[in-house]
């Protein structure tokens, strides 16, 4: 699938400060490795607009509310892009959003509004404690299924090699000639 090719990428928020989990952080329950986080959690006030990092096509946009017992994404958007150097597809993922402004199949440009960071303990936030954006970059195969926010050791539907440090990916992409 050929998606639009962004000439440059931008960060999804003007203030990119990781206030929650960061990419690759190992999450433990007691002393047991429970999972590895697959993106950056950027803590910002609820209502902060979230924008697309580059030209692309929306491949997923929906509300996955979950519950207070089984948390989920809330509002999630996944955008497909074509890398300008490798010509390979990659995907930007934005989770815990309210007021989604895009639909599947829509072609969007850099900076296009996707939604806003949702309030804590709401369906749009997926019932998480702190309002934040989960931002991730996925370079694996698109199978038209929801992508996870973390990788558990016993999970085999994703691989760590398919996930990139999102801030480093954006920075490196913009330095390539």
Label every PLM stretch briefly:
Residues 18-52, 61-63:
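Short glycine/threonine/proline-enriched tight-turn/helix- or strand-capping micro-motif at secondary-structure
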Residues 49-60, 102-117:
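Short, well-structured beta-strand-loop connectors
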Residues 76-79, 109-125:
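Short hydrophobic beta/alpha edge segments that flank linear recognition/processing sites
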Residues 41, 49, 78-80, 136:
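Residue-level detector of beta-strand face positions
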Residues 47, 82-84, 138-141:
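Solvent-exposed coil/turn segments that connect beta secondary-structure elements
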